[in-house]
Structures are given as structure tokens and as C-alpha cells.
Amino acid sequence: MYYHSLSSYSILFFLFSLFHHLPCASSNQGLGWCESLFQCGNITADFPFWGGNRHKPCGHPLLELHCNNNNITSLYISNQEFYVRQINQTSNTLTLARSDLLGSFCSSYAYNTTTLPPEIFELSPTYKSLTVLYHCDPKLSYRSSYTCPALGTFSMSQSVDYQYSCQNSFTVNVPTSFHPEERGLNLTNLESALRKGFEVKLVIDEIPCQQCSSTRGICSFNGTTQSCCNATSPSGGVSCVPYQHSADEVYRRCSESFSCGSQRDLNYPLWKPGREECGHPNFKLNCSGGFAEINIASVKFRILDSYRSLIRLARSDYIGDLCPANPLTAPFIEKFLPVLELTGETELLTLYYGCRFNSSDIPANIYVGELGCDEGRSYYVTRNLSSPLLDSSRGVLNNLREMCKRNVSVPASGPALFDLQTRPNQDNLKMALDQGFRMLITSDCERCRGSGGACGYNQTSSGFGCYCKDGKCGYEYDDGFFRRHRRFIATLVRYTFIALGALTGVVIVFLVLLCPCFRVQIFRKRKTSDEVRLQKLKALIPLKHYTYAEVKKMTKSFTEVVGRGGFGIVYSGTLSDSSMVAVKVLKDSKGTDGEDFINEVASMSQTSHVNIVSLLGFCCEGSRRAIIYEFLGNGSLDKFISDKSSVNLDLKTLYGIALGVARGLEYLHYGCKTRIVHFDIKPQNVLLDDNLCPKVSDFGLAKLCEKKESILSLLDTRGTIGYIAPEMISRLYGSVSHKSDVYSYGMLVLEMIGARKKERFDQNSRSDGSSIYFPEWIYKDLEKANIKDIEKTENGGLIENGISSEEEEIARKMTLVGLWCIQSSPSDRPPMNKVVEMMEGSLDALEVPPRPVLQQISASSVSDSFWNSEESSSASDILVFSTNSKLESSSL
């Protein structure tokens, strides 16, 4: 190899250039690192791949090839191993097969969905993705189904009638000719298709490497940016320069329209790989499958047509299918603004799935119809839920929201929805979804094109860019005119200055007098513009908008207080239909951004779960903020498990409440588009309805309140003493994450079964007020008591014997789950989906967790350590709502 002949200095210098990825100087022989090919079995590859003898800068970071002992080439995508069946570098395609699905489908050890990174891979048009639903209800009948020991009953039908009766799902890629729609799935055909694999196309701009090769350079990568390395001197100097498009090249590329799938003549803000400068980052197109699609918040929208300033889109999963698997509501409006805005004719069609009542229970209503999924237990509403036209239907809408498992809002054409209202049938509903909705380009693109420029995106300013030929746009002025009339122009200018001088005094006086008026007008215009924007955002939220006067009226001038918290006061209220509501009036919000409040309420409004408190409306009027949500007559769990409670709940009821809270937290962590971490789970934030069904409340409110200080003190730390996770206090225990909610849940469960004693906590608090003790005394109590004989007594303590075997099993299960959840290290705690599985599963499957090693933390260091732990936490996939919760002294 080349490196044997290199001097030590050259080797070190070249390695330095490899690892730092900078324009570098190295040995000319160093180019051999990228000239060598990757070879394994019958696979040979060069740029843009790397691996083996080809070092990392020689290829794209995501295209590392591996060769195992059997000479099989593999590639890892999102930690999933794929075998490389074939590489065709002429067409830039690969054939891949998942290594875990090469054998018997039922014996696979993992069933995970691996998403192909769209920035580098594009599924070939001759292949498609299918969803496999598993752990389905064996009592129901499914199309294209099979039963495996590990999967239970599973189905591959793409128009599943009972999609919500299956607990899990994952996707596989198969040829478009594969149709699993028969009654019983032919597993042999499926296994054969998976073994053959699927084809993907590499999404890499070929021009930079072609230009580099024309200069006898070596193609390489500086991170994800293509570079070209060339020898600069006979003595061996090498220079690696990142590729940059010239201004003329950008203008040429962006002034031309492009095609994607079946769509032609596409332009800004849409773009595809190779045209990054020509479109907005949020509008990258996926051209696989023969369609032009954009992905917003994990939801695909298909481009139906585009003409200059208008673009028509439709939800891809709803085209031709009213019952897609696991549909989501995409908060795409925030992504589109300010590049695109909805046209005035667009309405939001809301679809409800998995409802617990029949259509006969819904009174006749022109705005509400039957969807036709889930054996008829699914419905649609043809108007924005905030529309005044639906005021007379609030009772029906409340039932839909509370008794349906999922609701999805889909933009649709107003005229199409009007046709659906006048002639409600499945064909018109499909037509309304298939026709999509229109959006208007709001940027300066039309002006740019009119001046001869090409529309694009300026990476430096992160905004709209107008690219011009030779750097000039607009009309060219005729300099000859000025030469011919130079004397006349000079005279005109001289007399103009004289006239201006005479008027200067008068102008100054008028300006002084008019400035205050101008300031008022500008302020009013700006305020009007902001209000219009807020009104547009409000209109997109499927909740009732209340004025402050209406809030005051429904609460009878805020007379009946039902609760107080760190964010505001809760009042009971009554709507016009006599239904009871709870109204939380947030603390003074002067100086805060109303748009932030609207965006947060929008996120909160998209949660829909039986164990999550339902939001009914909101008020955003100046600095006044209020949240209106369902009223739960039984109040909080705290009054049922506190020492002062006169009502004792049996263990079965407590178990049902604990399981419901776990399911609610699982939904917040995994069921929402963006993970929601509560950070303040405690009995006061668990509300109970008339049937003692628990509902988690007060999530998302902290971000809606003003942050008073830049550095949080101990009393400003998220959570409540006694429930707060150790890592929230000190980084010694790990990073802050969704596992902090798991800890709080564990403490809640232990309190519910009486494993926590208020007097013990009070003693610890009084013994050393300057320190925070985590409850290791729980284990001491459990050592004294026999776990298998736990019983909840009247005062919440632990005694032995005298309980039924069923209650004994419940107590043991809740104790073990609680102890697993309060492990001091976040990595030792189970995630909430595992907690639900443990609570629902067999007691025999649970092991006694290890006793955590807990340390005494000085309160004086809490503030600094808290911030350190937060900064180190992985927050990229977490929407941290509780940013300013008060650390309250709870009565435990």
C-alpha cells in the first residue's frame, strides 16, 4: 500500500487532514486512500461509498460499507443492518435487504420501522412501503392476516378496517407487484420478497464529482459537503476545497423549472436534491413512487399541481383511502408560514376514529357525517371546530372528542366540503380529500421573476433570495441620455437645491408636529398586522375561542375557586349549554408573545386520549390568558389518598387509576407527534371523573407563563418535592429526560399503595432543612414488611396478612413497578411503554429491582447542578413544556 512509503511526518499530516476535514496540504500519495476501491465478495464500490481501505472522508457519512467474515456487504441505516445485494454506480442504485428479516418472518427477533434518510436515499418507483400491524385482536377478522407466536395476529392490509385494534406496527419495503390483499397472507411469498430486498436510489448531486474528476482530482466529503482534492505541487502538496456553485450556476439552475414524479414545471419554494439553493428548506420533495411529495411532521402531502403563485396539495395517506393506518394531524401551517398561506376557501375537515358510540346516537346535523371506518364508528365534521356555525352542535362535538380514540384535522377545499354537506356520501367525501387544498406563495418571488431574477433561498440570511444573471436584475438605464442633457440636469439640480433650502424650515416644523402622529399610525398598523396574524393562527386551532368577557361570564366573575397552582387559579364555570367546565386563568402575561401562547395551545389541543384532560377552548386577549377544559367532579387523586381523606379506595380501584395514569403518560411520551414531558406528576395533577377514570392534567402550561428570572433558584426547579427525579437536582444521577416522569410516576404509585409515609418524610425534612433526601427509607420499610403480604390500611401504612390473593397480587405488582420506576439512575428505569406492559402483564414476569445507591445532595448546589444536567440532556426529540414549574411543598 501507499502508506508504507510515507514519512512519519507525512502520515501524521495526512491523518490530521482526514480527521479535521479542512482545506489541507498533505502528500500526493495520500490521494491513494480515496483511489482504492471497497471490495467484498461480489460487491465493488468507490465514491460516494467508504469503508474498508476507503477512509471516512472518501464517502458520504451515511454510506459506510462493512464486510463480514462471510464476505457479505452490509450497510447500517438508523442502527438497522441491511445486506447490500447489489450496487449499480451507473444508475446510482442499491439493492438492500433487512438482515433481521431474511429467515422465517415469525422468528425475527425485532420488528422495528427503519426510515430511509430522505437526504441520501429515495425508494425506487418499482417498490412500495407496506405497514405490518401486529398484536391485533384475535377475536376480529382481518384481511391478509397471519398468526405468529411473537407477533400474535398480524395483518398487512393497507385499508385496514380495524386499525386501532392492533397494538403495534412497523413497515417493510416490497415490490409494487406484491399485493397482500387475500384473506389469508401467503407468508412464503412475503419471505421471498423480503429476502430479495428492495431498490433505493442515491440522492447525491453528481455534478461536483464530475467537475472534480475533469481536473484529475479525487472526489471526497467534508462532512456532508462534497469536496475536491487536487495535487498542488510535484513534491506532494494536496488541497481539498469544498464544492460551491457559482452565482451564474445558481441563477441558471434556479431559473429553470424542474420535474418530480408526475409533476412538471415546478419552481420555488419546492425543490429536490441538487436544487438546494432554489427552494425553501421546508419544501424538499420526495419524487419516489411517481409522485411529488413533501414531508411535514411525519405526514406526507402530495403536490397535485403548481402554477406560479398557487400550489395545490393533498394528504397522501387520504388519497383514495378514508381509513389509512395510524393517521396523524400535521401542524404544517407553522412550517409553511411565512412562505405559504392558506387561501380563503380552505376549511379544516376533522375526522374522528374509534368512537365508542353508534351513529344512531348522533342527532341529525348537516356538518357531521359518518366516515365508514371501524364498523361505522367513525365520523367527520366539515367545518373548522371553532366556527360559529357549530355553536349549536357543541354537545355532539364534545361527545366526539371525549369518546373517540383519535381525531385528525385535514385541510380541504371549502366548495368541496359544501358539496359534501348538501350531498353527504362516501364518494363526495373521497372527492373532497382527493381534491386537496390550495396555498398561496406569499414571498417576493413574483417581483423577483418580473425583474429577470430567479427565486431561491439564501443560506446566509436564512431567507428568500433573488438570484440574477451577472449579479444584476431589473432594467438597464441608458447612460447616453444623461450625457446629452447634462447642462439641463445640472441647472435643474441647482434650482431644486435652492427650493429645498427655502422649504427646509417649514418642513422641519411640520415633521416635529407630525412625528407623534406617525408613530401612533405605525404602531397601529404594526399592531393591526400582528392581530391579523394571530387571528389567522387562532383560526387553525380546533378549539372554541372565548373573549375575556365570556370567560368572566362563565365563571360568574371568578367567584368559585376549585384549585390553585403555580401557573394560576382554577375556577368552575358553566357554558351556555349548562355543561360544567374548569377555567384556569394564567398568571399575568404582560410582555409575553401571544403567538407563542397560540402555538402552545395548538400543540396541546392536538392531544386526544381517554387519560388526558380534554381542552375545550382558550382565551387570548391582550395579556389575558385562560384555558378552558373539561370539569371532573371528583377532583384530584390527592383527596382520595391523603391522610385526611374520608373515602378509602380498594386496591383494585387504585390499580385501575395507576394503570390509567401510566397509559396517559405513555401517550404523552410516544403517542404525540413531538414527545411531551410533564415534569410535575403528582396526585394533585391526576383528576378523576365520575367513574374514577384518571386524567393527567396541567401538562404544557408552564411554557405559557412568563419566565420571571433567567436563572432558576431551588424554588423554581421543575417538579414537586417528594416526586422530583434525582437527576433534576444533580447531574450525578444522569441527564434530564422523559425518564424523569417515570420516577415521579413511581413515587405516585408507591404513595397510592401506602408505601410512602407522610410522617417519615416530615421527619427527614425537619431533621436537616438544608438537604434533600430521596426516599431510600422505602426500602427499609419493605425490608421490615413482607412484600407478599402488603395491605393498605386506613392510615396508608403497610401491615401483614389478612388480604385476598387477588389484592395481594395487585399490591405486589404495584410495589415492584413503583420500585423499578424510582431507580436513581434514569437508564435503570423502564420507559413508560414498558411500565404499561409491566402493569398489564403477569406478576411472575416481574423481578425485584436492585436497591438504588442514593446520595445526600446539598440544597445550595441544586441550582447549578440542575442547569448542568439540563444542558446535557438530549432534548432534540423532546418538547419540554414545563419550563417554569414551581417546586411546591406537597402534603405527602
UniProtKB/Swiss-Prot annotation:
Residues 518-892 are cytoplasmic. It catalyses: L-seryl-[protein] + ATP = O-phospho-L-seryl-[protein] + ADP + H(+); L-threonyl-[protein] + ATP = O-phospho-L-threonyl-[protein] + ADP + H(+). One of its GO terms (molecular function) is protein serine kinase activity. The modification Phosphothreonine is found at T547, T717, T720. It holds the Pfam family GUB_WAK_bind. Residues 556-854 form the Protein kinase domain. GO terms for cellular component: membrane. Gene3D superfamilies: Phosphorylase Kinase, domain 1, Transferase(Phosphotransferase) domain 1. It is found in: Membrane. This is LEAF RUST 10 DISEASE-RESISTANCE LOCUS RECEPTOR-LIKE PROTEIN KINASE-like 2.8. It comes from Arabidopsis thaliana.
